[in-house]
Regions:
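Active-site beta-loop-alpha junctions enriched in small/polar residues
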Residues: 182, 211-215, 269-273, 336-338, ...
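Acidic, contiguous N-terminal accessory segments
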Residues: 3, 9-11, 15, 19-21, ...
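Hydrophobic faces of well-ordered beta-strands that scaffold small-molecule active sites
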Residues: 175-179, 206-208, 264-268, 331-333, ...
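Active-site neighborhood of glycoside hydrolase catalytic domains
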Residues: 277-380, 384-401
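Flexible, acidic glycine-rich loops studded with aromatic residues
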Residues: 88, 374-377, 385-525
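Feature activates predominantly on carbohydrate-active enzymes
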Residues: 112-300, 310-312, 320-323, 327-330
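Conserved, mostly hydrophobic/aromatic
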Residues: 66, 83, 130, 177, ...
């Protein structure tokens, strides 16, 4: 265990990735300018309904414009930014035009985040009730054009969208990813890069794990030593993860995510996983003695002092400051692996802390252990277990709680793909792409009805991560499997279709410089 902190993921050499990219570009240049039109169903995640039409689709030309007004205009601007590099076309965004157009329209009548995309030779119309629905439709539209359209240099190609109609909406309201900043700190630029990739697959929540035994990664003004000590150099697993987010950093990430219709969910883990906080403030221990800093990967040894008033002053200050700078509805209070907190004390803690989240206008959110507390009624419960039933979660659901599913043996992105995977962990088993894909959220917990499922989330813990390349390698392509489970209807769940669509997406990741795992289960283009 002592060497784990020095483990780094071994990704394909930069030279190899560059060579592959050059091969792709060279091959593209040697092909005829026309290629087969991508089908309406060749999209990740799978669309709900697709009705191809005979005849020609819509051809982008130098005269094409994008029309949008009001709240639709920013989404139209992002579409134009994505399509200009490869086409070399100006693609101006205008309020109205008689020219050949891609029109983005806000109108009533569509499901929340849903959209309708109509494509014909005379034009394209994308309709939704909310800007989030338009943004989801834009992600679909981008995938209906060849990967080269978003390259850095204009391509000599005729860009054609397939004719027909797509009507689409998400299966679940919550489709999330989690990134652990505590075990290893990831800089804001790395988080923004991850947000960019998440948004391509209609992920709409990013859960940031901001504190743990090894580090504290968010500035709290009323307790400044949390980051001065818990975010100092030498913190993190193996001592290789120093750093923290200032409040300005955090607010900018919230804004950046919101521009991509992603909600940030902050997490402060307690009453366990608090060693870093106790190193900074020994009064948070029952004996007033600071524990030693920890850079190993063990869990379950730390606990706040449940009988001390200072514990609740600390908890309230942290919750209040986080709530003030978090516009999203959720605030995650952890609650997992509190093995050093006696059961009665754990219930006492949750009885006092969960109402504090509501006091500051947020919905309490926690790992499924909080379901043991009657105070968790109405909270969001994040199930991370491997069992097929959970009586405490079922009881919380009966009292009004909703559930986000993150089964460790299906959705934990830090698990190895197989026994030869460099980096990553294996305590929940190996998770190849098909393992991540082949489950139904509605049937995971036998004692929880689908009506209580808010959605799914794919956590990525950072014990063996060090940089964006490590994030890429473990998150992709498995995160796309979880995204499809969250967005696409149950009827669209088909491994053969998914693996074909995933394999065809590979050139887009190569273009974006994403060092994804080339799973042998997938025939990569």
């Amino acid at each position: 265990m002592g060497t784990v902190g020095r483990v780094r993921l071994i990704r394909p050499a930069v030279a190899l990735v560059t060579a592959l990219s050059l091969i792709t570009v060279t091959a593209s240049a040697s092909r005829p300018p026309e290629r087969p039109v991508i089908a309406l169903t060749d999209v990740l995640p799978a669309v709900a309904e697709a009705s191809p039409a005979p005849g020609d689709g819509f051809r982008l030309t130098s005269g094409t414009v994008i029309t949008a007004s009001g709240a639709a205009a920013p989404v139209a601007g992002r579409l134009a930014e994505a399509l200009r590099p490869g086409t070399g076309f100006p693609l101006p965004v205008v309020a109205d035009s008689g020219a050949r157009a891609i029109a983005l329209v806000l109108e009533p009548g569509h499901p929340d985040e849903g959209y309708r995309l109509d494509i014909g030779p005379a034009g394209v119309t994308l309709r939704a009730t909310r800007p989030a629905g338009l943004f989801a439709g834009v992600q679909t539209l981008r995938q209906l054009l060849p990967p080269e359209i978003e390259s850095d240099a204009p391509q000599r190609r005729r860009w054609v969208l397939p004719a027909g109609t797509i009507v689409d909406a998400p299966r679940y309201a919550y489709r999330g990813a989690m990134l652990d900043l505590a075990r290893h700190f990831h800089e804001p630029a790395e988080i923004r890069r991850y947000l960019d990739q998440l948004s391509r697959f209609k992920i709409n929540h990013l859960h940031l794990h901001l504190s743990d035994d090894q580090g504290w990664r968010i500035r709290i003004d009323s307790w400044p030593k949390l980051t001065e000590v818990g975010g100092a150099p030498g913190t993190g697993v193996g001592g290789a993860g120093g750093g923290f987010l200032t409040k300005d950093d955090y607010r900018e990430l919230v804004r950046y995510a919101a521009d991509r219709f992603i909600t940030i969910v902050p997490e402060i883990d307690m009453p366990g996983h608090v060693n870093a906080a106790q190193v900074a403030y020994p009064e948070l221990t029952c004996d007033g003695v600071a524990p030693r800093p920890r850079t190993d990967m063990r869990v379950g040894y730390s606990s706040l002092c449940v009988s001390a008033d200072v514990t609740y002053r600390f908890a309230e200050d942290v919750i209040r400051e986080l709530a003030e700078m978090t516009p999203g509805p959720y605030l995650h209070v952890g609650g997992d692996e509190a093995m050093s907190t006696p059961h009665g004390s754990y219930l006492t803690f949750q009885k006092r802390v969960l109402p504090l989240v509501r006091k500051y206008g947020k919905i309490p959110y926690g790992w499924h252990e909080i379901a043991q507390s009657p105070s968790a009624a109405g909270a969001v419960i994040q199930f991370w277990g491997r069992e097929r039933n959970s009586p405490s979660v079922a009881t919380a659901v009966a009292a009004g709680s909703r559930v986000v599913l993150s089964p460790a043996n299906r959705s934990y992105l830090d698990m190895k793909y197989d026994m030869l995977t460099p980096g990553g962990l294996a305590w929940a088993g190996y998770i190849e792409v098909r393992t991540a894909y082949d489950w139904d959220p509605a049937r995971l917990l036998s004692d929880v009805p689908e009506s209580a499922i808010l959605g799914v989330e794919a956590p990525l813990w950072s014990e063996t991560l060090r940089d964006s390349g490590d994030i890429d390698f473990l998150a992709f392509p498995r995160l796309v499997a979880i995204a499809e489970l969250g967005w696409s209807p149950r009827a669209a769940h088909d491994w053969s279709s998914f693996r074909a669509r995933l394999g065809a997406y590979g050139p887009r990741w190569i273009r974006d410089g994403v060092g994804f795992h080339r799973s042998p289960q997938i025939n990569w283009s």
